[in-house]
Amino acid sequence: MAHFPDTSGMTGVLRPLRIEGDILDLEVEGEIPAQLDGTFHRVHPDAQFPPRFEDDQFFNGDGMVSLFRFHDGKIDFRQRYAQTDKWKVERKAGKSLFGAYRNPLTDDASVQGMIRGTANTNVMVHAGKLYAMKEDSPCLIMDPLTLETEGYTNFDGKLKNQTFSAHAKIDPVTGNFCNFGYAATGLLTTDCSYFEIDPAGNLLFETEFQVPYYCMMHDYGLTEHYAIFHIVPCSPNWDRLKAGLPHFGFDTTLPVWLGVVPRGPGVTNKDVRWFKAPKTIFASHVMNAFEEGSKIHFDTPQAENNAFPFFPDIHGAPFDPVAARPYLHRWTVDLGSNSEDFAEVRQLTSWIDEFPRVDARYVGQPYRHGWGLVMDPEMEMEFARGRASGFKMNRIGHWDHATGKEDSWWCGPQSIIQEPCFVPRMADSAEGDGYIIALVDNLITNYSDLVVLDALNLKDGPIGRAKLPIRLRSGLHGNWADASKLPIAA
C-alpha cells in the first residue's frame, strides 16, 4: 500500500498527482484563437511510488508529460508518464528502487549501473519526435501525439556524451537542434560536449571540452557562432554523496565563469575562451544571448546568493530568501579583449523574475521582447507555499528591451503561475506578435487552468482560459510546436 511521506515536497500543492488520461475538448472561458494549431507540451516531476528516502528532492520525481493540442479554437488534453528505464523497472517491482536525487550510492543493488534518468525537466518536438530530457541522462524519445515512449537514443551510436541537457535550443536559421551535456563521461566529471542535430534528426558533430569545475550546468546561451556556458558554484563532490547530503551545495568561495565555445565541427578544448565574473553570484536560466561585433551579450536572471534552499551553502551559512531573489541581468564579454574579465554586468529589470522566455524565432539573435515569471510580494496572497523553491510567482512579465517598457498580468491572490511559453500569431508575424500560454495553479480550489494572453498586452488578462478538472503538479519546462512540425497524416 502506497504512502507518501508527510514532507514539504510531497504534500499540499506538491502532493504527487500520478494521473494518466485524456480529456477531449476542455471547458473554455473566453476564446481560444482559432489560428492556434499545434501542441503545447510540458512536464512535471511526479513519483509513481513513494521515495526510498522521505526527504527526497522534488526534482527526483518521474517525468509526467502533459500535451495540450490546440485546433479549431479547442484544446484537447493528454497526460502520460515518460516510461524511462527507471520507471519500467520500478513499475515491475511495485516500489521505488532508485535512491536519492543524483546519488547512485543510495540505489537498491538490483538497479546499480542502470540509467537513473527521469525525463522530468523539459520536452521539445524535433524531427517529428518528442525529446524528453533530464540533464543527468540520455534523451528519451516519445511520440508527440500519442505520448507513447520509444526509449533512449544515442543517435545511432554517434553521440558519445552520456547526458543530454534539458535546455536545448533550435537555431531559427539552420533548424538545427543545439544542445550539450555535462558530466559527459561520468558523474562529477568536468567533461562536457556541445553538439548539433539536423532537422531530420541526424547528429552533425560533437565538440568535447572541459569546464573549470563540475557544477549544475542547467541551461546555456546560443548565438550565431558560439555556445555560451555559465559556471556557477552549485557544486558537489563524492564526500557529500557518501555522507548522504544533497547532491548540490552552494560554494561561495568559487568564482563564476562564462565559457565561449565556437560552433562547428573540428573545435577542440583549446578553442574555448573563459571569462571571469566580478563576483560570485547565482544564475540558472538564460533568456537569450547574441553577438554585437566582438562582444557577446548573455541575459540571465541573477541572484546575489544561492536561490535553492534545498541545495544549501556548503559552509553552513543560512539561506537568505532576499539575497536569493533573481533579477534579469545582461552579462557582456568581449572576444576582442585580452582580459579574462567581464566587460560589463547590467541589471535589465526591477522585477523579481525567473523562467525567462523569448520568441523562439529570435534565439541567438539580437532581440527586443522577453517574458518570464515575476514574484510580486506586495500583492495579496491567500496561500502559504508556492513552488518547491519557495518562490510565489504571481505575475507574467513582459520586457521591451528597446523601450524599457514593462507590462504584466497578475493572476490573483489564490494562484501561482508556471513557466510561460510564447506562440507567434502567424509564422511570419513580427517579433513578439503572438500569444503567451501558461498554466495557472489555484492553490485554494486545487485546480489548474491553461491561460492564453496577448503577448504584447499582458495587462488585459487572458483572452481564453481552458479549465482542467484536476490540478497539475508544479512543472518545470515546456514548448510549443506548430502543427507543421507534427506527424499528422494529411
UniProtKB/Swiss-Prot annotation:
UniProt-listed Pfam families: RPE65
The record's free-text note on cofactor binding: 1 Fe(2+) ion per subunit.
Summary of activators and inhibitors of this protein: Activity is high with beta-5 type stilbene and minimal with beta-1 type stilbene. A 4-hydroxyl group and trans-stilbene structure is essential for the binding of substrates to the enzyme.
Organism domain of life: Bacteria
Binding residue positions for Fe cation: 167, 218, 285, 477
EC top class, as a word: oxidoreductase
One MF annotation (Gene Ontology) recorded for this entry: iron ion binding
Cofactor: Fe(2+)
EC number: 1.13.11.43
Alphabetical UniProt keywords: Dioxygenase, Iron, Lignin degradation, Metal-binding, Oxidoreductase
One GO process term, biological-process aspect: carotene catabolic process
Catalyses which reaction(s): 1,2-bis(4-hydroxy-3-methoxyphenyl)ethylene + O2 = 2 vanillin
Family, per entry: Belongs to the carotenoid oxygenase family.
Biological function: Catalyzes the cleavage of the interphenyl double bond (C alpha-C beta) of lignin-derived polyphenolic diaryl-propane type compounds (Stilbene).
Quaternary structure, from the entry: Homodimer of two beta subunits.
Stated name of the protein: Lignostilbene-alpha,beta-dioxygenase isozyme III
Organism: Sphingomonas paucimobilis
Encoding gene (name): lsdB
